[in-house]
Every structure is written in structure tokens, then in C-alpha cells.
Amino acid sequence: MKKKAQPAKVSYFFGPGWNDLKTFIKKFWEFTQEDIKKRAEKVEKGKGVMSLSGAASLLSCFSLILFGSLFFLAIAFTVSLILGLIFLLVYLLFFLHWISDRIHLIRNKIFVACPSCKSKYFIPTYICPSCGARHSDLTPGKYGAFFRTCQCGKKLPAHFLLRRDRLEAECPNCGHSLSGTGNRPLCVPIIGGRSSGKTAFITAFSCEFIERVAPRNGMEIQHYNKENHDFYEKVLRSHYLHGTSMQSKEATDIKAASSVAFSFMVHHKKMKPDRLIQIYDIAGETFVNNTENELQLHYTYSEGIVFVLDPLSIPSIRNRLDEGISEVDKSSVGTLDVDLVLDSFLNKLRQITGHASGDALDIPIAVVISKADIRTVDEFIGDEKISAYLSQNGLDMNKYTAVEDRLCREFLTENGMAHFVNAIDMKFKNNRYFKCSAIGHSRERGRYNPKGVLEPMEWIFQTTDNGMKSIWHDSEFEKL
């Protein structure tokens, strides 16, 4: 496939150099022809070829034609060979620069994940800060090994060592503005039915991680862009402080993304490159009804999946609700069948990744039972239940999450969800169960007091990213 021409000046060694060689050979041949022509004219003006001097001039002319041509060929060949070897060496150096750039991207798992169309690229479209020209392949090559000269004369870095990622960039597919193009993305979709608690989970995790986990572990946070910063301050943080939540909205504009990403970058002096955390949220109705405006391509490169399961969507639990539950919480009971949500998700995974229906997937999945502060649920999987299990079996607190995992599985199995547990085990090689209360109390009763929202994400990061594991290891994820 032919590469698109770039708005830049071609390197001397990929065009102008060969043109100069052709010009040299042409001029040298013209000089040789001119010399032969002069000798021929001298023969014509002489005493004739029958005279001694005329015969000598004719012989000299033939000698010039023969030896001049041979000399021309020898010089042209020698110059072409020397320059060809020099150019070949330069091409090898250019190739090594390109290889080093690509190895850096692959080894560090650096790529561009567009939060809008979900497309994945090694290299985005970079924008010249001087003239706004768009460069879709800003890598070492025919336009330069380390720098590329834009059509406006501005020199642009074409290698990761020169911090190419500091340039403004956009998605080559949809034109969406991009940030953190030199970072390693950690993409985690949060899936679940309507009113399962996905958005509250995202709100609680984002605020807890940014304001508590990051400072405690020496991480520096940078928001993806101004839009994400404003969304965090005016929406997520506002809900966090007031104990409210919002429903994920179905995208009514067919040009708008159905799955919305909240993104921020994490920097730590011991972790290279920086991480770009992208948390995806999608409305339950859109997810189950298969009415997304875009292919959910991020499933192909996600670090893990968080499946939020509303225990109140389980009939046996819903029928045993304690009378103390508030009307607000009653109105937010998930109505979608958990098996239907799981089937929809698995169908999408097969459609996008091409996996056969019988294949077990490598991607880790954290099944999170939400609303665990409700008394009916707490009786099965609450802290007291876990502590009692630890005590009865002589286990220390390092086994807390392992016991949590076991009790959550037993809770679902005992309440008619054995088929769901079996399906997760069959379809996902690496799975773990958690409980959480994103708000920590009934909605609209004050600031969030979340419990259990950090552990699922920490487990995913520890499982897939040694860099994050080295700087964030608040919990132990052992097995019984």
C-alpha cells in the first residue's frame, strides 16, 4: 500500500541526492561529447585524412571516442558506486532509527487509543505548530531520520527521543484531538446493566485514585485535556461531594460516541513511560440493545474489564430487601437480567476480536457486586462475614481479597446465579470477584464514603502492568 505524501521536504538522500548524481553524470557526458565534437571539427578543417597530420588527428578522434567513453563509464560507475554505498549506509542508519523508534513503542506498549472512535494506532496525525499542516507518519524515513522539515520550514521531531509526543495530535480516522501520545494506555471498560452502579463506581474510583491513592504513592496526575478536567471538577467531583449519581445517557446524536471515556495521565519517577488511564462508560440500554454509534474497538486492547453486577437485579435478593432501604435506592434497582448483559458482552467480544464462541479469553475480568452496603447483601458478603471466615480458618488479612472472592461466588451460586459464575469461569481464564459500595450509603445523604472501588482496578493493573504494580500495591491478591 502506497504511503500518503507528507507536507514536508524529502531528505537529500531520498531524492535530491540521486538527482544530483544524475545531473553530474549527464554534465560529464556532455563534456565528453563536446570534446569529441571539437576533435572532429579539427579533423574536418585539417589537410585531409590522407595527410600525415590528418591521419593522426583522425586516429586521435577515434581514440577519444573509445577511451573517452570508457573513461566516462569508469568515472560514472565509480562515482555511482561510492555514492550508492554511502546512500546505502545512510538508508541503513535511517532504518535503524526507525527500528529503534518502533521497538520503543512495542516494548513499552505505547500506542494511541482514540477515546472517540476507539481506533488504535502506533503513530497519530501530528500537527505542525507553525502552519497547522498534518503529518500522518512522523517517523524516521525519507523525510528525515531525527527531524522532519515541514513545508513551512519548521523542523519537527520524528523520533521518540526528541519528544515527538509533545506535538499537538489528532486521530487519523476521526480527527479527534489526542493527548498523551507517548504514554502507555491502560483502558478499562466498565460494563453492566442500567442502574447497576457503573457511573457511581467510575465517580468513586476516579476521585479516590486522583485525590488519595496518587498523592500517597508519589504519583502526579495530569488530566487528558480541558474538557476532561472540567468534567472531573464540575461533574464527577460534584457528585462525589454531594452523594449523588447520574445515569449513563444514551447517545442521541449518531455522530457522538456511545461509549464515553474519562481519561487522565499518571506520572511517577520510577515508572516509564507515563500511563494514560482511560475508563469507559456506556449506557446499559445501548449496550444490551446493540445500538452503539461506533464499534467498541477498545475491547481488543483493554487491560481488563470491570463487570458491575447489581445484586438487587437478582430476584431472590430483591424479594428479601430489608425495610430500611430508602425510596431513592429502591428507584435505582437494576432491571436488566445479568445473564442478558453478559451474553451481550460476550457476543460483542466475539464480533470484534474474532474469537470463537468456545475460546477462553485472556483478558482479566473483575466482577464487582455493587451496593454491598445494603443490609440484605451485607449479610452474605460484608466485612463481618469475611472477618469471621478468616478467624474460623486461621487466615491472616493477606487473604482478605481471596476470602472476598470465594464468598462472592458462593453468594451468587446460592441465589440462583450458578450459571453466571460458571459462564465467567468458562469464558475468562483470569477472573476475580469483589464487593463494593461506591457511594457508601444511600444516595443524596452526603459525601461519598466508598468501599471496595479501588481493589478491582488495582487487581487489573497489578495483573497486567508491572510498572503500576511497582508503585501501587496497597492490597494483596492471593488465592485460597
Please report, for each region that a protein language model flagged, where it lies by residue.
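Conserved G1/Walker A P-loop phosphate-binding module
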Residues: 101-149, 154-255, 267-277
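Switch II of P-loop NTPase G domains
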Residues: 254-268, 272-306, 312-323, 448-451
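Short linear interaction motifs
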Residues: 94-96, 168-173, 181-187, 258-259, ...
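Basic, amphipathic N-terminal segments
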Residues: 1-58, 87-148, 154, 479-480
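Hydrophobic alpha-helical transmembrane segments of integral membrane proteins
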Residues: 55-96
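Short, flexible loop/turn elements at secondary-structure junctions
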Residues: 192-194, 266-270, 283-286, 369, ...
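Conserved GTP-binding G-domain of TRAFAC-class P-loop NTPases and closely related GTPase folds
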Residues: 303-480
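Catalytic micro-motifs at enzyme active sites that drive phosphoryl/nucleotidyl and oxygen chemistry
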Residues: 175-177, 248-254, 263-268, 291-296, ...
